[in-house]
A protein has these predicted regions:
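An N-terminally biased module of ancient metal coordination in phosphate/nucleic-acid-related enzymes
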Residues: 1-82, 169-170, 182-266
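A short alpha/beta connector and helix-capping loop motif
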Residues: 32-36, 270-282
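C-terminal regulatory/interaction regions
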Residues: 245-246, 263, 267-273, 284-294
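Extended substrate/RNA-proximal surfaces in nucleic-acid metabolism proteins
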Residues: 2-5, 61-215, 219, 278-284, ...
Length: 294
């Protein structure tokens, strides 16, 4: 039976792409859970960048609220110079292969962010300490460009984080430095080694790269064991949604949706794109009980 059940975003279900203060979101896991409950979502997932640091707090909040929770991570990757984000769910966080990969990516991201700030300080009134002031959970936070953007906002250079990302913090700016990242194939192998489920996030968003993942690149990931594609995301234009749905249907992939919520860090509204209950059940079935260690 095909896992492609909807040609349009489901009206009810789970938001399984959300960020908190443990990466580049502005709200705590507890606030995420409570807002999801108030919206009447069937469940929610925490998916901070390259970390599981917020899982324990999210699980405690979900138990208190009586809201189903999916534990996940948005993993930074690269595929032939295309920057790719991959959502991993229901994996063992104690798996050495995946935890070492996260540690390496976070360290590389920290070095890169410092180098970007060094470039920016030549033209803008910010320092590394100003950036650290925007980090809410210290060393447990995955630090990156959003924290630079927030420092620029605090300095009065820009009005919002989005404004900073449209200019000085943009991947097209002279200050930009890419983050050394594992390959998409390495990510899939690591997630599978940890017993998890892996989905390519916002694969059709043209604003994120000069070029998108090609059908051939996606087919290679499918051959490696890719589970699904995030189709329902505000960054995917209609023609890309149609393309991704066709690929998902052809290869019987899971089709997911998520808001990419960052609290006040982005205009994305919690619950604006959802994943249906049957798809979440299939993610649960395929993965391991990653919350049993918390």
């Amino acid at each position: 039976m095909s896992h492609v059940r909807y040609a349009a975003p489901p009206a009810q279900g789970w938001d399984i792409h959300c960020h908190t203060v443990f990466s580049d979101g502005t709200e705590t896991p507890g606030t995420l859970v409570e807002q999801a409950r108030l919206l009447g979502l069937h469940g929610v997932a925490i998916a901070d960048h390259d970390t599981t640091a917020g899982w324990r707090e999210a699980r405690a909040a979900a138990r208190k609220a009586g809201l189903p929770l999916l534990l996940g991570t948005e993993i930074t990757a690269v595929d032939d110079d295309v920057s790719v984000h991959m959502l991993a769910f229901r994996y063992d966080p104690a798996n050495t292969r995946i935890s070492d990969m996260f540690a390496g990516t976070r360290a590389a991201r920290l070095r890169r962010t410092k180098r970007m700030v060094e470039r920016l300080t030549e033209d803008y009134p910010i320092t590394w300490d100003d950036v650290l002031d925007q980090v809410k959970e210290g060393e447990r936070t995955t630090i990156g460009r959003p924290h630079i953007a927030d420092a620029l906002v605090a300095a009065g250079v820009y009005r919002t984080r989005s404004d900073a990302f449209a200019d000085a913090v943009s991947a097209a700016s002279k200050y930009y430095i890419p983050t050394p990242s594992p390959s998409t194939h390495e990510v899939i192998a690591s997630v599978k080694d940890a017993g998890g489920v892996v989905v390519v996030a916002h694969a059709g968003d043209p604003r994120r790269n000069r070029r998108l993942l090609s059908d051939a690149q996606l087919n290679a990931l499918i051959d490696d064991g890719l589970d699904g594609l995030e189709v329902w995301h505000r960054g995917n234009p209609p023609e890309q949604r149609e393309r991704l749905l066709a690929i998902a249907s052809r290869h019987d992939l899971l089709v997911t949706g998520g808001s990419d919520w960052h609290g006040k860090g982005k205009p994305n509204a919690l619950g604006e794109n959802l994943t249906d209950d049957d798809t979440v059940r299939e993610i649960m079935r395929r993965g391991v009980d990653s919350g049993s260690r918390f």
